[in-house]
UniProtKB/Swiss-Prot annotation:
Gene: nadK
E.C. number(s) listed in UniProt: 2.7.1.23
Pfam families referenced in this protein's UniProt entry, alphabetically: NAD_kinase, NAD_kinase_C
Chain positions recorded as NAD(+) binding sites: D72, G73, N146, D147, R157, K174, D176, T187, A188, Y189, A190, L191, S192, Q247
InterPro entries: ATP-NAD_kinase_N, ATP-NAD_kinase_PpnK-typ_C, NAD/diacylglycerol_kinase_sf, NADK
Cystine residue pairs: none
Compartment(s) where it occurs, according to its Swiss-Prot or TrEMBL record: Cytoplasm
Cofactor: a divalent metal cation
Family annotation (SUPFAM superfamilies): NAD kinase/diacylglycerol kinase-like
Organism of origin: Pseudomonas aeruginosa (strain ATCC 15692 / DSM 22644 / CIP 104116 / JCM 14847 / LMG 12228 / 1C / PRS 101 / PAO1)
Annotated GO biological process: NAD metabolic process; NADP biosynthetic process
Phylogenetic classification of the source organism: Bacteria, Pseudomonadati, Pseudomonadota, Gammaproteobacteria, Pseudomonadales
Protein name per Swiss-Prot or TrEMBL: NAD kinase
Length: 295
């Protein structure tokens, strides 16, 4: 296992807490005689940092490890940019839930130190590729670590669509939308819509209808290598949107097709050696502790 030498830092803008944590992290890494590289947008609000700066794309090409300081939203954005470069990513939580950024600020030096000493776990998380097509023309493409969501946008009207899996017709449906989520995204929007929690190691995709106008409609878990096709009804009067991780958005027209499949590149997500997925679920989702008051 090669030691990490070139460490990139990405952070969420607009937060003094994030900047304070980045300053601590920078000092800690420099004290360990490591080469530290700042994302250029963060460098602009850290005057006098004296470090090399670059874009996320370049960071993925030159770094051995990238540390993301922020919440899960910050990690989602970084993941889409860095997965293609296979650079491992570590998260320090400065958000709310922190399913992906699981190091607390108060344990920064201890946990990051363990990772630098080779004591860590690496998980591979797959991303989804979403393509919006109008006939043979591509109208938009996006990647998602959590989910791809078809929704009505600013309209309050229901969407009518057909769903196909691996070329086979599944159903037509009227609903407020449809969530297509990875195991990583199963604890995000899909969970709020009544979908199941899927362990990150599962090679599966969950399809969750949003308020379907059909009592028998339920979430479906399919093989992770499935190709999903959503055909927006040509008779609709609204223009629904497709959102990737809630951050990238594309507008569909009636009759458009949304194709969703797994991307070949995977995010390499690093956790501290004592990472416990079920403990995180228990803590973040408020599950009950052991009977008798144990941990």
């Amino acid at each position: 296992m090669e030691p990490f030498r070139n460490i990139g830092i990405i952070g969420r803008l607009g937060s003094t807490q994030v900047l304070d944590t980045i300053r601590r992290l920078k000092k800690f890494l420099i004290d360990r005689h490591l080469h530290v590289i700042l994302e250029d947008t963060i460098a602009e609000v850290l005057p006098g940092h004296g470090l090399q700066t670059c874009s996320r794309k370049i960071m993925g090409e030159i770094c051995d490890l990238v540390v993301v300081v922020g919440g899960d939203g910050s990690m989602l954005g970084a993941a889409r940019a860095l997965a293609r470069h296979k650079v491992p990513v570590l998260g320090i939580n400065r958000g709310s839930l922190g399913f992906l950024t699981d190091i607390r600020p108060d344990e920064l030096e201890a946990k990051v130190g363990e990772v630098l000493d080779g004591q860590y776990i690496v998980e591979s998380r797959f991303l989804l590729d979403a393509q919006v097509r109008r006939g043979i023309d591509s109208m938009g493409q996006g990647d998602a670590l959590n989910d791809v969501v078809l929704h009505p946008g600013k309209s309050t009207r229901m969407i009518e669509f057909e769903l196909y899996i691996d070329g086979q017709f599944v159903c037509s449906q009227k609903a407020d939308g449809l969530i297509v989520a990875t195991p990583t995204g199963s604890t995000a929007y899909a969970l709020s819509a009544g979908g199941p929690i899927m362990h990150p190691k599962l090679d599966a995709i969950v399809i969750v209808p949003m308020y379907p106008h059909m009592l028998s409609s339920r979430p479906i878990v399919v093989d992770g290598n499935s190709e999903l096709k959503i055909v927006v009804s040509p008779n609709m009067q609204i223009y629904p949107q497709v959102s990737c991780d809630g951050q990238n958005h594309f507008t569909c027209a009636p009759g458009d097709t949304v194709t969703i499949s797994k991307k070949p590149q995977k995010l390499r997500l690093i956790h501290p050696i004592d990472h416990n997925y079920y403990e995180i679920c228990r803590t973040k989702l408020g599950w009950g502790s052991r009977l008798g008051g144990g941990d």
